[in-house]
Amino acid sequence: MTNPNNDTSTDNPDILDLLPRLQDGDAGVRRIALIELADLEEPEALPWLTRALTRDSSADVRAEAARLLEAWEEPEVVDALCAALTDADARVRGAAAQSLSELKSAEAGRVVLPWAVHADAFVRASALRALRELRLIDSVPTAVAALQDSDAFVRREAVGILGWLKQSDALPLLARLASDDSDTEVRRAATGALGLASDDSVLPALKAALKDREWQVREEAATTLGKVGQATAGPALLEALSDSYWQVRLRAVRSLGRLRFAAAHDGLVELLGHAISNLRKESALALGELGDDQALPALLAVEHDADPEVRKAVRIAIGQLRLQKA
């Protein structure tokens, strides 16, 4: 049977049963019919779903179609979802962006890639977001160019792609964003992406980020310094133990333990008495990582901490130190 209103046709009885409601004058009826159509999980139903996404007069129906197409990666579906990123209704654009972010195949990514240079910033950012999850090497040049985009969301998604793909050639550009970008989230994302470095070339940028005016960036810098694994980061992390935000101090504690920075001993012992239990717990674990049995008296003094998670961490640290001492 051919639908008189479009060029789609089918002999599938389940789809045929739904056609009258798919063409109903009531948008609510059409939306429910679309849901039932998607439940069939039939590739043959895709033309009706994509038509609803691109042509239905109701934003509710278009948004529903965008959500229902999430699991499909046929080129025509992906292209329709990309086109829906330009829809006049924000709900439709958001649903299309979410469905695109669930794509898994490189073939789908190649359909998305041209949309990453669209004139509209939301389209560019959404396309880059979808490409990030796909780890499509073809997207690297586009992502590098997007690091200089005027829109912060686009820059942040570009950083994500380069980080996921571990593009070490982009490290100088990422370091500059980590230090100089005007947007907090871009600086934070770029700081995290510097963790892919295998040498100390990014340490100046990370140390600068550890003094950023926004604590979220400082927190990311403290974490990333531990991942880079350079002992020369120790003094900067030690200084971060006095940061005004406990979240930054906590990440600095973890990184100091990870680096086994011996000079952190006194600072970590002091934090065993901090009012925030998470800091006490992480400090105990870090002291265990340092491997200095001179921390045993301080750990034994807090083995009956009021917080069970702290007590557990203290026991782990004491066990580590005693094992090394034996």
Name every feature range the model reports, one short phrase each.
Residues 10-21, 42-55, 74-86, 105-117, ...:
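Amphipathic alpha-helical scaffolding segments comprising HEAT/armadillo-like alpha-solenoid repeats
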Residues 58-157, 161-164:
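A generic tandem-repeat structural signature
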